[in-house]
């Protein structure tokens, strides 16, 4: 069973994260406004809480899993480069000295 879970994608790109955050905040705000208005009209604070909680659950369902909509812009990594400093011994490296500020 765990083999199936490990094959699921778990990453989002930066634009996908931004979209998920905007959707999350928009759904929460919308449900809070609707919940407040309905709770005020019905004179039941409980309905306000239920509507906001339903909006929260809905927004979590839409934004927490890494749906394909959030992975449209994959990161392009730079190729690995050899750094010349690893081949040198510690005594051969140049030491940078900063000028003293008086």
UniProtKB/Swiss-Prot annotation:
PTM text: May be phosphorylated.
GO cellular component: signal peptidase complex
Keywords noted in UniProt: Endoplasmic reticulum, Membrane, Transmembrane, Transmembrane helix
Name of a matching Pfam family: SPC12
Membrane topology annotation: Multi-pass membrane protein
Segments on the Cytoplasmic side according to the record's topology features: 1-19, 70-102
Region named Disordered: 81-102
InterPro entries with a match to the protein in the record: Spc1/SPCS1
Disulfide bonds: none
Biological process (GO), any one: protein targeting to ER
Ranges per topology, Lumenal: 43-46
Regions annotated as coiled coil: none
Protein localization: Endoplasmic reticulum membrane
TM regions (residue ranges): 20-42, 47-69
Annotated PANTHER family: MICROSOMAL SIGNAL PEPTIDASE 12 KDA SUBUNIT, SIGNAL PEPTIDASE COMPLEX SUBUNIT 1
Assembly: Component of the signal peptidase complex paralog A (SPC-A) composed of a catalytic subunit SEC11A and three accessory subunits SPCS1, SPCS2 and SPCS3. Component of the signal peptidase complex paralog C (SPC-C) composed of a catalytic subunit SEC11C and three accessory subunits SPCS1, SPCS2 and SPCS3. Within the complex, interacts with SPCS2 and SPCS3. The complex induces a local thinning of the ER membrane which is used to measure the length of the signal peptide (SP) h-region of protein substrates. This ensures the selectivity of the complex towards h-regions shorter than 18-20 amino acids.
Similarity annotation: Belongs to the SPCS1 family.
Function field: Component of the signal peptidase complex (SPC) which catalyzes the cleavage of N-terminal signal sequences from nascent proteins as they are translocated into the lumen of the endoplasmic reticulum. Dispensable for SPC enzymatic activity.
Identification of the protein by name: Signal peptidase complex subunit 1
